[in-house]
Amino acid sequence: MEYTGRIIKGVGSFYTLLTDNGEFVCKARGRFRKEGITPVPGDYCRFETGDDGKGCITEILTRKNLLIRPAAANIDKLMIVLSSSLPRPDYCLADKLIMQCELSDITPVILLNKCDEMDRETYEAALAQYKDTGYDIIPVSARDGTGIDRLKAEIAGSTCCFAGQSAVGKSSLMNALAPGLELPVGQLSDKIDRGRHTTRHAQLWQVCGGCMLDTPGFSLLDMAEIDPAK
């Protein structure tokens, strides 16, 4: 049988697709690799299942957009999470993420997380960095609930991808938005004030009347794949 679904996660060579009939685990046809196409979370696909129940992705439908890193497709908003305390904000990384948004018709939203434990100097520096950009800047706290209702309103009716350094609190925010997720939460290294990875793969969740995508934290973003002419 043939179905249409949306990739909600990919682990190794296996992809989980969400359909009106539930979830299916599929592999992608070899021709995608030959054509240099990699299925990513957010992709809408056609796939077939055999009598054994195993699925195979046969077509990736036209993408509205594609993020390089985090790898995701058909995104409406990119929630760029910065910490108001530790780890210190990586503005270079945030600016590269914003550049991806501008080139891909994605709305960037700046989330200043951990505002309940903010370092005032760090918080005000982050505000100053982006206050004249015209982008929405939302102070939030997964711990005391600051900004969570506004964040839910941002997600409603949209597909939102959360991105940023490790330990800035992406998974904590998602747990606050949808407590039933119970995503693992990382800790900050006492020695180097950097986060440890807890999210191992990107996953799309249907919550708050929309979709949100949790992604692994990272600190490097190579822009070499973007056409310099753009």
Segments from the language model and where they lie:
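Structural detector for short beta-strands of small beta-barrel domains
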Residues: 1-11
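Helix-rich effector regions associated with P-loop NTPase G domains
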Residues: 13, 30, 36-53, 61-78, ...
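SH3/SH3-like beta-barrel fold
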Residues: 15-19, 26, 47
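A short macromolecule-binding patch
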Residues: 23-30, 56
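Charged helix-capping and loop-helix junction motifs
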Residues: 93-96, 124-125
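Canonical P-loop GTPase G-domain recognition
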Residues: 116-168
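A conserved segment at the C-terminal end of the G1
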Residues: 170-186
